[in-house]
Amino acid sequence: MISLSLLYRILTLPIILVGTTILYFTIGTNFPHDELRHNLLSTLFCSSMLHLSKGLTVKDVRIFFHDSIGSTLLKNRKKLNSENELPNYGEKFTHKYDNQDMPDSVWLAKVNGMTKSDPIILHLHGGMMALPYDKVILVGLSNLYKLFSTTMNRPPSILLVDYSLVSQGYTYPKQVRECLNVYQVLISKGFRNITVLGESAGGTLILSFLYQISELSKLNKVVWPKGVALISPWLDLTNAKKIGSYRANDGLDVICYETLNRFGKAYVNNEESLFTSSVVNINMNCDISIWSKIPPIQDGKVLVLFGENEVFRDEILSWTSKIGLLKAYPNRVLMDKQGIHIGLFLEESPSIGPGMTNLDIWKKKFSVNSLYTFLRETFEE
Protein backbone atom coordinates (compact mmCIF):
# COMPACT_ATOMS: atom_id res chain seq x y z
CA MET A 1 0.00 0.00 0.00
CA ILE A 2 1.19 3.50 -0.79
CA SER A 3 2.63 5.43 2.15
CA LEU A 4 0.54 8.17 3.71
CA SER A 5 3.39 10.62 3.19
CA LEU A 6 3.40 10.06 -0.57
CA LEU A 7 -0.41 10.00 -0.76
CA TYR A 8 -0.48 13.44 0.85
CA ARG A 9 2.07 14.69 -1.69
CA ILE A 10 0.05 13.31 -4.60
CA LEU A 11 -3.17 14.91 -3.35
CA THR A 12 -1.50 18.31 -2.94
CA LEU A 13 0.43 18.17 -6.22
CA PRO A 14 -2.21 20.16 -8.21
CA ILE A 15 -1.72 23.08 -5.82
CA ILE A 16 2.04 22.98 -6.44
CA LEU A 17 1.56 22.86 -10.20
CA VAL A 18 -0.84 25.82 -10.21
CA GLY A 19 1.42 27.82 -7.91
CA THR A 20 4.51 27.06 -9.99
CA THR A 21 2.72 28.08 -13.20
CA ILE A 22 1.68 31.42 -11.70
CA LEU A 23 5.23 32.08 -10.50
CA TYR A 24 6.65 31.09 -13.89
CA PHE A 25 4.63 33.79 -15.66
CA THR A 26 5.11 36.44 -12.96
CA ILE A 27 8.07 36.79 -10.58
CA GLY A 28 9.82 33.54 -11.42
CA THR A 29 10.08 30.14 -9.75
CA ASN A 30 12.68 28.61 -7.43
CA PHE A 31 14.47 27.29 -10.53
CA PRO A 32 16.14 30.35 -12.11
CA HIS A 33 18.45 28.50 -14.51
CA ASP A 34 18.10 29.86 -18.06
CA GLU A 35 17.04 26.48 -19.46
CA LEU A 36 14.17 26.22 -16.99
CA ARG A 37 13.10 29.86 -17.20
CA HIS A 38 12.24 29.22 -20.84
CA ASN A 39 10.60 25.80 -20.47
CA LEU A 40 7.40 25.62 -18.41
CA LEU A 41 6.96 21.85 -18.74
CA SER A 42 10.47 21.12 -17.50
CA THR A 43 9.99 23.55 -14.63
CA LEU A 44 6.74 21.82 -13.66
CA PHE A 45 8.54 18.47 -13.86
CA CYS A 46 11.26 19.70 -11.48
CA SER A 47 8.70 21.16 -9.06
CA SER A 48 6.76 17.89 -9.10
CA MET A 49 9.94 15.89 -8.57
CA LEU A 50 10.87 17.91 -5.48
CA HIS A 51 7.35 17.88 -4.03
CA LEU A 52 6.75 14.14 -4.49
CA SER A 53 10.22 13.04 -3.43
CA LYS A 54 9.71 14.58 0.01
CA GLY A 55 7.09 11.92 0.73
CA LEU A 56 8.71 9.02 -1.13
CA THR A 57 9.67 5.84 0.74
CA VAL A 58 11.49 2.70 -0.36
CA LYS A 59 8.15 0.87 -0.19
CA ASP A 60 6.61 3.39 -2.61
CA VAL A 61 9.46 2.86 -5.06
CA ARG A 62 8.83 -0.88 -4.91
CA ILE A 63 5.17 -0.31 -5.84
CA PHE A 64 5.57 2.26 -8.61
CA PHE A 65 9.05 1.79 -10.07
CA HIS A 66 9.98 -1.75 -10.99
CA ASP A 67 10.83 -1.84 -14.70
CA SER A 68 14.07 -3.49 -15.77
CA ILE A 69 16.30 -1.63 -18.19
CA GLY A 70 15.19 -4.00 -20.94
CA SER A 71 11.51 -3.18 -20.51
CA THR A 72 12.27 0.55 -20.15
CA LEU A 73 14.16 0.56 -23.44
CA LEU A 74 11.35 -1.34 -25.12
CA LYS A 75 8.68 1.08 -23.87
CA ASN A 76 10.68 4.11 -24.98
CA ARG A 77 11.99 2.82 -28.29
CA LYS A 78 9.98 5.33 -30.35
CA LYS A 79 11.27 8.21 -28.24
CA LEU A 80 14.90 7.11 -28.13
CA ASN A 81 15.50 5.21 -31.35
CA SER A 82 12.71 6.06 -33.78
CA GLU A 83 15.07 6.22 -36.76
CA ASN A 84 17.29 3.32 -35.70
CA GLU A 85 20.17 5.67 -34.97
CA LEU A 86 21.28 3.57 -32.00
CA PRO A 87 22.84 0.37 -33.39
CA ASN A 88 22.21 -2.86 -31.47
CA TYR A 89 19.77 -1.00 -29.22
CA GLY A 90 18.84 -3.10 -26.18
CA GLU A 91 21.30 -5.93 -26.81
CA LYS A 92 22.23 -7.81 -23.62
CA PHE A 93 25.86 -7.85 -22.48
CA THR A 94 25.78 -9.56 -19.08
CA HIS A 95 22.97 -11.54 -17.49
CA LYS A 96 21.90 -11.34 -13.87
CA TYR A 97 23.30 -14.00 -11.53
CA ASP A 98 22.66 -13.05 -7.91
CA ASN A 99 25.03 -15.56 -6.37
CA GLN A 100 27.88 -14.16 -8.49
CA ASP A 101 26.99 -10.48 -7.99
CA MET A 102 26.44 -10.08 -11.71
CA PRO A 103 23.65 -7.74 -12.88
CA ASP A 104 22.00 -7.36 -16.24
CA SER A 105 23.74 -4.89 -18.50
CA VAL A 106 22.43 -3.71 -21.85
CA TRP A 107 23.80 -1.71 -24.76
CA LEU A 108 21.96 1.53 -25.39
CA ALA A 109 24.10 1.66 -28.51
CA LYS A 110 26.93 -0.58 -29.72
CA VAL A 111 28.80 0.25 -32.91
CA ASN A 112 28.71 -2.43 -35.57
CA GLY A 113 31.90 -4.42 -35.92
CA MET A 114 33.06 -3.28 -32.51
CA THR A 115 36.81 -3.65 -31.89
CA LYS A 116 38.82 -3.76 -28.66
CA SER A 117 40.09 -0.22 -29.23
CA ASP A 118 36.67 1.34 -29.79
CA PRO A 119 35.58 3.76 -27.03
CA ILE A 120 33.00 2.62 -24.50
CA ILE A 121 30.96 4.61 -22.00
CA LEU A 122 30.07 2.42 -19.01
CA HIS A 123 27.09 4.15 -17.42
CA LEU A 124 25.93 3.78 -13.82
CA HIS A 125 22.60 5.46 -13.12
CA GLY A 126 21.42 7.44 -10.12
CA GLY A 127 18.22 7.14 -8.12
CA MET A 128 19.32 6.92 -4.46
CA MET A 129 20.24 3.24 -4.97
CA ALA A 130 16.51 2.49 -5.11
CA LEU A 131 15.09 3.84 -8.38
CA PRO A 132 15.68 2.11 -11.74
CA TYR A 133 16.77 3.72 -15.00
CA ASP A 134 14.61 6.69 -15.92
CA LYS A 135 13.63 7.95 -19.36
CA VAL A 136 15.08 11.37 -18.49
CA ILE A 137 18.56 9.85 -18.27
CA LEU A 138 18.14 7.71 -21.37
CA VAL A 139 17.10 10.73 -23.46
CA GLY A 140 20.30 12.52 -22.51
CA LEU A 141 22.48 9.48 -23.20
CA SER A 142 20.83 8.77 -26.55
CA ASN A 143 21.34 12.42 -27.55
CA LEU A 144 24.98 12.05 -26.54
CA TYR A 145 25.47 9.04 -28.80
CA LYS A 146 23.75 10.79 -31.70
CA LEU A 147 25.99 13.81 -31.18
CA PHE A 148 29.13 11.68 -31.27
CA SER A 149 27.88 9.85 -34.36
CA THR A 150 27.93 13.18 -36.23
CA THR A 151 31.49 14.01 -35.18
CA MET A 152 33.32 10.67 -34.90
CA ASN A 153 33.70 7.80 -37.35
CA ARG A 154 33.49 5.37 -34.42
CA PRO A 155 31.23 6.92 -31.77
CA PRO A 156 31.40 5.54 -28.23
CA SER A 157 29.21 2.54 -27.48
CA ILE A 158 27.13 3.05 -24.33
CA LEU A 159 26.64 0.19 -21.86
CA LEU A 160 23.93 0.53 -19.19
CA VAL A 161 24.35 -1.34 -15.90
CA ASP A 162 21.05 -2.46 -14.34
CA TYR A 163 22.44 -3.00 -10.85
CA SER A 164 20.34 -4.41 -8.00
CA LEU A 165 18.28 -1.90 -6.03
CA VAL A 166 17.44 -1.26 -2.41
CA SER A 167 13.76 -1.33 -3.41
CA GLN A 168 14.31 -4.93 -4.56
CA GLY A 169 15.76 -5.90 -1.19
CA TYR A 170 19.45 -5.55 -2.06
CA THR A 171 21.74 -3.41 0.08
CA TYR A 172 25.39 -2.40 0.33
CA PRO A 173 27.86 -3.67 -0.85
CA LYS A 174 26.07 -5.65 -3.59
CA GLN A 175 25.66 -2.66 -5.90
CA VAL A 176 29.39 -1.84 -5.79
CA ARG A 177 30.34 -5.46 -6.49
CA GLU A 178 27.94 -5.72 -9.42
CA CYS A 179 29.18 -2.56 -11.12
CA LEU A 180 32.80 -3.59 -10.63
CA ASN A 181 32.04 -7.05 -12.03
CA VAL A 182 30.55 -5.65 -15.25
CA TYR A 183 33.65 -3.51 -15.66
CA GLN A 184 35.84 -6.57 -15.11
CA VAL A 185 33.94 -8.48 -17.81
CA LEU A 186 34.70 -5.68 -20.27
CA ILE A 187 38.36 -5.84 -19.27
CA SER A 188 38.43 -9.63 -19.58
CA LYS A 189 37.19 -9.29 -23.16
CA GLY A 190 40.10 -7.01 -24.00
CA PHE A 191 38.37 -3.61 -23.99
CA ARG A 192 40.59 -0.81 -22.69
CA ASN A 193 39.16 2.47 -24.01
CA ILE A 194 36.56 2.69 -21.25
CA THR A 195 35.24 5.83 -19.60
CA VAL A 196 32.91 5.39 -16.64
CA LEU A 197 30.04 7.88 -16.43
CA GLY A 198 27.56 8.19 -13.58
CA GLU A 199 25.16 10.71 -12.07
CA SER A 200 24.17 11.08 -8.42
CA ALA A 201 24.22 7.61 -6.79
CA GLY A 202 25.93 6.34 -9.93
CA GLY A 203 28.79 8.71 -9.14
CA THR A 204 29.08 7.19 -5.68
CA LEU A 205 29.26 3.70 -7.16
CA ILE A 206 32.01 4.77 -9.57
CA LEU A 207 34.14 6.19 -6.77
CA SER A 208 33.44 3.14 -4.60
CA PHE A 209 34.63 0.74 -7.25
CA LEU A 210 37.66 2.90 -8.04
CA TYR A 211 38.56 2.60 -4.37
CA GLN A 212 38.08 -1.18 -4.59
CA ILE A 213 40.36 -1.34 -7.64
CA SER A 214 42.91 0.68 -5.68
CA GLU A 215 42.79 -1.90 -2.90
CA LEU A 216 43.12 -4.76 -5.41
CA SER A 217 46.12 -3.05 -6.98
CA LYS A 218 48.10 -3.63 -3.78
CA LEU A 219 48.16 -7.35 -4.54
CA ASN A 220 47.51 -7.70 -8.27
CA LYS A 221 47.97 -5.92 -11.55
CA VAL A 222 44.80 -4.03 -12.41
CA VAL A 223 43.38 -2.16 -15.39
CA TRP A 224 42.00 1.29 -14.69
CA PRO A 225 39.27 3.12 -16.62
CA LYS A 226 40.70 5.55 -19.14
CA GLY A 227 38.42 8.30 -17.88
CA VAL A 228 35.84 9.06 -15.19
CA ALA A 229 32.91 11.49 -15.48
CA LEU A 230 30.81 12.30 -12.42
CA ILE A 231 27.61 14.33 -12.63
CA SER A 232 26.34 15.60 -9.25
CA PRO A 233 27.91 12.70 -7.32
CA TRP A 234 26.23 11.80 -4.02
CA LEU A 235 29.18 11.64 -1.63
CA ASP A 236 27.62 11.53 1.85
CA LEU A 237 24.88 8.91 2.00
CA THR A 238 24.35 8.45 5.73
CA ASN A 239 26.42 11.00 7.63
CA ALA A 240 25.36 14.35 6.14
CA LYS A 241 24.09 17.18 8.31
CA LYS A 242 21.51 19.74 7.21
CA ILE A 243 23.98 22.59 7.01
CA GLY A 244 25.70 24.51 4.23
CA SER A 245 24.23 23.88 0.79
CA TYR A 246 21.86 21.24 2.19
CA ARG A 247 20.11 24.08 4.00
CA ALA A 248 20.88 27.02 1.70
CA ASN A 249 19.63 25.22 -1.42
CA ASP A 250 16.67 23.51 0.21
CA GLY A 251 13.74 24.19 -2.13
CA LEU A 252 16.02 25.34 -4.95
CA ASP A 253 16.93 21.80 -5.99
CA VAL A 254 14.89 18.75 -7.04
CA ILE A 255 15.96 16.68 -4.02
CA CYS A 256 16.11 17.39 -0.30
CA TYR A 257 18.15 16.39 2.73
CA GLU A 258 15.41 14.38 4.46
CA THR A 259 14.73 12.11 1.47
CA LEU A 260 18.43 11.54 0.81
CA ASN A 261 19.07 10.70 4.45
CA ARG A 262 16.18 8.23 4.47
CA PHE A 263 17.30 6.39 1.34
CA GLY A 264 20.99 6.55 2.24
CA LYS A 265 20.36 4.71 5.48
CA ALA A 266 18.19 2.17 3.66
CA TYR A 267 21.15 1.50 1.34
CA VAL A 268 23.15 0.19 4.32
CA ASN A 269 20.08 -1.63 5.69
CA ASN A 270 19.95 0.87 8.57
CA GLU A 271 23.13 -0.60 10.06
CA GLU A 272 24.30 2.13 12.42
CA SER A 273 27.87 0.83 12.29
CA LEU A 274 27.97 1.89 8.62
CA PHE A 275 26.51 5.38 9.11
CA THR A 276 30.00 6.82 9.62
CA SER A 277 31.79 4.41 7.29
CA SER A 278 34.37 6.01 5.00
CA VAL A 279 33.73 3.22 2.49
CA VAL A 280 30.02 4.09 2.23
CA ASN A 281 30.48 7.86 2.53
CA ILE A 282 33.09 8.80 -0.04
CA ASN A 283 33.36 12.36 1.31
CA MET A 284 34.91 10.84 4.45
CA ASN A 285 37.29 8.83 2.27
CA CYS A 286 39.56 11.62 1.13
CA ASP A 287 43.11 10.46 1.83
CA ILE A 288 45.08 12.34 -0.80
CA SER A 289 47.81 9.67 -0.73
CA ILE A 290 45.24 7.16 -2.07
CA TRP A 291 43.16 9.20 -4.51
CA SER A 292 46.04 11.14 -6.04
CA LYS A 293 47.59 7.83 -7.11
CA ILE A 294 44.48 6.60 -8.94
CA PRO A 295 45.50 7.07 -12.60
CA PRO A 296 42.37 8.84 -13.95
CA ILE A 297 42.57 11.34 -11.08
CA GLN A 298 46.35 11.60 -11.14
CA ASP A 299 46.33 12.33 -14.88
CA GLY A 300 43.36 14.70 -14.87
CA LYS A 301 41.18 12.24 -16.81
CA VAL A 302 38.26 12.95 -14.51
CA LEU A 303 35.38 15.41 -14.84
CA VAL A 304 33.10 16.52 -12.01
CA LEU A 305 29.97 18.47 -13.00
CA PHE A 306 27.50 19.92 -10.51
CA GLY A 307 25.07 22.80 -10.04
CA GLU A 308 25.44 25.97 -8.00
CA ASN A 309 21.94 25.50 -6.57
CA GLU A 310 22.11 21.82 -5.75
CA VAL A 311 22.20 20.47 -2.22
CA PHE A 312 25.37 18.44 -2.90
CA ARG A 313 27.39 21.51 -3.89
CA ASP A 314 29.40 21.94 -0.70
CA GLU A 315 30.32 18.28 -0.21
CA ILE A 316 31.44 18.03 -3.85
CA LEU A 317 33.65 21.10 -3.51
CA SER A 318 34.99 19.87 -0.18
CA TRP A 319 35.88 16.38 -1.41
CA THR A 320 37.48 17.49 -4.66
CA SER A 321 39.55 19.96 -2.66
CA LYS A 322 40.65 17.43 -0.04
CA ILE A 323 41.87 14.89 -2.61
CA GLY A 324 43.81 17.59 -4.46
CA LEU A 325 41.75 17.48 -7.66
CA LEU A 326 40.42 21.03 -7.41
CA LYS A 327 43.93 22.44 -7.04
CA ALA A 328 45.66 20.22 -9.60
CA TYR A 329 42.95 20.30 -12.28
CA PRO A 330 40.52 23.18 -11.58
CA ASN A 331 39.21 22.92 -15.15
CA ARG A 332 37.93 19.42 -14.31
CA VAL A 333 35.66 20.54 -11.47
CA LEU A 334 32.91 22.59 -13.09
CA MET A 335 29.91 24.29 -11.51
CA ASP A 336 26.87 25.24 -13.60
CA LYS A 337 25.66 28.72 -12.62
CA GLN A 338 22.24 28.44 -10.91
CA GLY A 339 22.22 24.78 -11.93
CA ILE A 340 20.37 22.02 -10.10
CA HIS A 341 21.07 18.35 -9.43
CA ILE A 342 21.97 16.42 -12.62
CA GLY A 343 21.25 19.54 -14.63
CA LEU A 344 22.62 18.02 -17.83
CA PHE A 345 19.59 15.73 -17.87
CA LEU A 346 16.90 17.80 -16.13
CA GLU A 347 17.74 21.24 -17.54
CA GLU A 348 19.56 20.64 -20.80
CA SER A 349 18.08 17.35 -22.07
CA PRO A 350 14.35 17.58 -21.37
CA SER A 351 12.40 14.39 -21.96
CA ILE A 352 9.10 16.29 -22.00
CA GLY A 353 8.10 19.34 -23.95
CA PRO A 354 10.04 20.45 -27.03
CA GLY A 355 12.56 17.74 -27.93
CA MET A 356 16.18 18.39 -28.68
CA THR A 357 16.37 17.95 -32.44
CA ASN A 358 19.19 20.39 -33.15
CA LEU A 359 22.34 18.73 -31.84
CA ASP A 360 24.46 21.74 -32.80
CA ILE A 361 22.48 23.86 -30.34
CA TRP A 362 22.38 21.13 -27.70
CA LYS A 363 26.15 20.60 -27.63
CA LYS A 364 26.71 24.30 -26.83
CA LYS A 365 24.89 24.05 -23.52
CA PHE A 366 27.21 24.27 -20.53
CA SER A 367 27.05 20.75 -19.06
CA VAL A 368 26.60 19.00 -22.40
CA ASN A 369 29.56 20.83 -23.91
CA SER A 370 31.71 20.15 -20.84
CA LEU A 371 30.96 16.43 -20.91
CA TYR A 372 31.22 16.10 -24.69
CA THR A 373 34.57 17.90 -24.80
CA PHE A 374 35.98 15.84 -21.94
CA LEU A 375 34.84 12.52 -23.42
CA ARG A 376 36.17 13.32 -26.86
CA GLU A 377 39.56 14.33 -25.48
CA THR A 378 39.70 11.16 -23.39
CA PHE A 379 38.71 8.83 -26.23
CA GLU A 380 41.19 10.27 -28.70
CA GLU A 381 44.29 10.32 -26.48
From Swiss-Prot:
Positions annotated as glycosylated: 193
Q: Give the EC number.
A: 3.1.1.-
Domain of life (superkingdom): Eukaryota
Q: Where in the cell is it found?
A: Cytoplasm; Endoplasmic reticulum membrane
Q: What is this protein called?
A: Putative steryl acetyl hydrolase mug81
EC category name: hydrolase
Where is the catalytic site? 200
InterPro entries associated with the record:
AB_hydrolase_fold, GDXG_lipolytic_enzyme, Say1-like
Pfam families registered for this protein in UniProt: Say1_Mug180
Q: What is the lineage of its organism?
A: Eukaryota, Fungi, Dikarya, Ascomycota, Taphrinomycotina
Q: Which residues lie on this side of the membrane: Lumenal?
A: 31-381
Instruction: Give the record's family classification.
Output: Belongs to the 'GDXG' lipolytic enzyme family.
> Alphabetically, which GO biological process terms does the record hold?
meiotic cell cycle; sterol metabolic process
Q: Motif (Involved in the stabilization of the negatively charged intermediate by the formation of the oxyanion hole) spans which residues?
A: 125-127
